[in-house]
Amino acid sequence: MKKIETSALIGLGALGILFGRKMPGVQVIADKARIARYSAEPVVCNGEECQFTYVAPEEGRPVDLLLVAVKATVLEQAIRDMAKFVGPDTVILSVLNGITSEEHIGAAYPGHTLWSVAIGMDATRTGRKLVFNQAGKIQFGERSGEMTARVQAVADYLDACGIANEPCSDILYKQWNKLMVNDGLNQAAAAFDQPYGGLRQPGEAQDMMRKAMQEVIQLANLEGVPLPPDNDVKFLDAMMPTFNPEGMPSMRQDVLAKRPTEVAEFAGVVRERAKKYGMPTPANDFFYTRIREIEAGYNK
């Protein structure tokens, strides 16, 4: 595996900005209308303007590393848009929420994808402005757990960029752990209209958040991924105090901006997979119904 030198990014939301701003020479894939919009109103991250190079899908050339940071709701379009940026040796990293994006990308570009997850950030995006305290890190690895040459090449590249990263031999465990977090935190913040600080207070939002997280732990165990029974408590005790109390996870940001949410990737996937085992998911049923109701009310 040769050294990674060229890179592209698709998706300039919170994660795309957080990581893309540190990738020298990264090409941001965007259609012409979006390029015009981005050029007219540049991204500002923690008060600093970010300078990106934009490239239309039809003008792409293969790159060494392609970072996919779109919302799950537009993944299929992104897969089409990045076609010309994928060459024989391109490595694809997807930092999408949920546990299914690598399967979708892998179906279109077999053999190119490393499994990955972005954790520990508390970024809040409003329009073209992003504010964060914690920049987070990318955990990644082969689905098989093997520490291959391309895993090392990606680690070397991210290190050189100054992006915190962790090559993993247990990436499926890490993905399910992140799903547990999103399933609780993201959905509770959206359904109960609460920032991080509100979720730290005892009450219905926190109760439902914990119940949803427990359902993910139970389902992960059924799927052969050994999340510990107290995994939710460990996360909440360790990480919640580090988050900006006024900040909020991405799903609440989507709801406030009246954007489609990723509820299908959280409660939707949990409910669907749980059916295989006859496992009830009352907390995720509640979140799925409530968030779909919120989305349905956007235009009323």
Q: Predicted segment positions?
A:
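Short, charged/polar "capping" segments at the starts of alpha-helices
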Residues: R34-S39, E102-E103, T148
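NAD(P)+-binding Rossmann beta1-loop-alpha1 motif at the extreme N-terminus of oxidoreductases
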Residues: M1-F52
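Short internal beta-strands
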Residues: V28-D31, F140, R271
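Short active-site oxyanion
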Residues: E5-T6, P24-V26, D64-L66, P88-I92, ...
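Internal alpha-helical scaffold of NAD(P)-dependent oxidoreductase catalytic cores
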Residues: F85, A108-G111, K129-D230
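Rossmann-like NAD(P)(H) cofactor-binding subdomain of soluble oxidoreductases
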Residues: C45-K129
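NAD(P)-dependent Rossmann-like dehydrogenase/reductase catalytic/cofactor-binding core
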Residues: K2, R210-K300
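Hydrophobic anchor at the start of a short beta-strand
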Residues: S7, G25-Q27, G111-L114, N165
